[in-house]
Amino acid sequence: MMMTAIGLMSGTSLDGVDVALIKTDGRRVGALGPSGYRPYTETERSLLRQALAEAVQLTARDARPGVLAEAERAVTIAHAEAVAAFVAQNRLSPGSVDIVGFHGQTVLHRPAEKLTVQIGDAKALAKAIRIPVVCDFRAADVAAGGQGAPLVPVYHRALAQSLGRDGPIGVINVGGVSNVTYIDGTDTLIACDTGPGNALLDDFMFRTLGKPFDCEGRLASQGVIDQAWLTEALQHPFFAKPTPKSLDRNDFANLTLRDWSPADGAATLTAFTARAIAAVQPLLPKPPQSWIVTGGGARNLTLMRMLREALAPASVESADALGWSADAMEAQAFGFLATRGLKGLPLSYPATTGVAFPMTGGLLARP
């Protein structure tokens, strides 16, 4: 039975809350509905940056010491406002939406310690929006020994079924962290994080220019890549690890950045993202013949050019060019995953997160 789901995603880029409507039975995508966006205020972003810094000390997934409790309240309120605005704008009644998938804000992800922490109060959200909410998508996988990420691949597969393309397809999601899904038209589904997405570049832009990101990659297009630094950065042990594998937003934060000009730094860090994605190819059964780029990185024209160079001769195109939505993809995915979780269907697999067996997930909070 098809359900109407709203998915909510607040990624590691800390830019805001993506909202998307999807009709799905948890196996197939019936229709993609409208999408929306509620940006975080600079005050909220600052609070979340503090929460990320303090979360490094966490040893329990339900602990909310200090600023984390305040950040959780802010995240919950922002998501409630995002849903309220989306429902009003699209003239939906709460009764017309069956379920909301609420990812929350990841502040710590350490699967080796069986610890992943997403802040956001699902019970308070369900009460505020008067719609049942599924949350806590990653915890069961991590508790069972999986990486807890990426979770979107099963949604990528559902979308790719409608393309009818020959040969393997790779779907690249460039958020704060980048990840790749490998789909070959059979039951094979392989996925992993590939390295930094927008996080290093966004942090660099904020530190050097006070800007949240490099709009369309304009600054990077004017810079010169520091090839020596790039070669050294690609020696990071993460890149040689077999799939599946996952990252925390801060796993590359200790890389020593040089005293670049803003343009050269942007060019170098954008190239690092592209080359890190290309480095996953030898770890896949066959190189994909076509790549589809989603997430905020699909809007970065310089990154798209660098990906085409790094992944040639394969084709590289934005999800938007296929009628998908590069911006709404992850939000749609969590609507899809909420429906799968309600039905007890797997969210993760051995070749996507390394979990020992297909694993469902998610907890239900009722209004």
Swiss-Prot record:
This is Anhydro-N-acetylmuramic acid kinase. Catalyzes the specific phosphorylation of 1,6-anhydro-N-acetylmuramic acid (anhMurNAc) with the simultaneous cleavage of the 1,6-anhydro ring, generating MurNAc-6-P. Is required for the utilization of anhMurNAc either imported from the medium or derived from its own cell wall murein, and thus plays a role in cell wall recycling. It catalyses: 1,6-anhydro-N-acetyl-beta-muramate + ATP + H2O = N-acetyl-D-muramate 6-phosphate + ADP + H(+). It comes from the Bacteria. Signal peptide: none annotated. The gene is anmK. One of its GO terms (molecular function) is ATP binding. Belongs to the anhydro-N-acetylmuramic acid kinase family. The keyword DNA-binding does not apply.
